[in-house]
Amino acid sequence: MIDLYYWTTPNGHKITMFLEETGLKYKIFPVNIGKGEQFEPEFLKVAPNNRIPAMVDHEPKGGTKPISIFESGAMLLYLAEKTGKFLPADLYGRYDAIQWTFWQMGGLGPMAGQNHHFRNYAQDKLQYAIDRYVNETNRLYGVLNKRLSDREFIAGDYSIADMACYPWVVPYKNQGQDIEQFPHVKRWLETIKLRPATERAYAKAKEVNPNYGQPAIRTEEERKILFGQTASVVR
């Protein structure tokens, strides 16, 4: 059994997508980041960076005691190795999938995240910051579109690379992107959306968070919790 500490964000969706694809048994422990539940001591034992998702696997492959893992990329890699699925076994295919997963972790995710912040949540509309992150997100969409121009999925068969990237492309409108400019990304997006496991994963989001799909920031308290963090919150 896997305990999944989860909230309805792109990084959270990555893990439910994988778990639904493989049928691994898991239990969701909601961590409402708008209420500050990511700072609870019990959660910090699993996720010292006070970010979701995180998980505890009570039956690790080859292990004798439970293992806890945080960071969505590390979690995807762990789950792929545990199940032997969604990560090629051969050297070249394996590192192709891994490098594109890291591309999302180091590029698409952070840039799209800052894009969301300055376009949608920042109280002061700083045009330089908006342009900077909208343009960089646009460049990254271009990289992905080129990659998908001659293949169905990012790294051969459907893999953790696709699961890592997909949730960050779903909200393309909030990122100021015109999906029609990226036809290969659009086709890829529509293909993954129709997978039964993807449908189940996103259905989980609506079950866990009744406000899913609405603006993430609804009160000043939520704004303070999400955007006012300093080293003082590390306990």
Task: List the model feature ranges, each with a label.
Residues 79, 92, 101-197, 203, ...:
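GST-like fold's C-terminal all-alpha helical module
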Residues 205-235:
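Acidic/histidine-enriched, glycine/proline-rich intrinsically disordered or flexible terminal extensions
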Residues 1-131, 135, 145, 219, ...:
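GST-like domain detector, emphasizing the conserved glutathione-binding G-site
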Residues 32, 160, 205-208:
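Short, solvent-exposed turn/loop segments enriched in Gly/Ser/Thr/Pro and often Arg
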Residues 19, 197-198:
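Short beta-strand edge/turn micro-motifs at domain boundaries
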Residues 36-37, 190, 209-211:
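Short secondary-structure boundary/hinge segments and terminal tails
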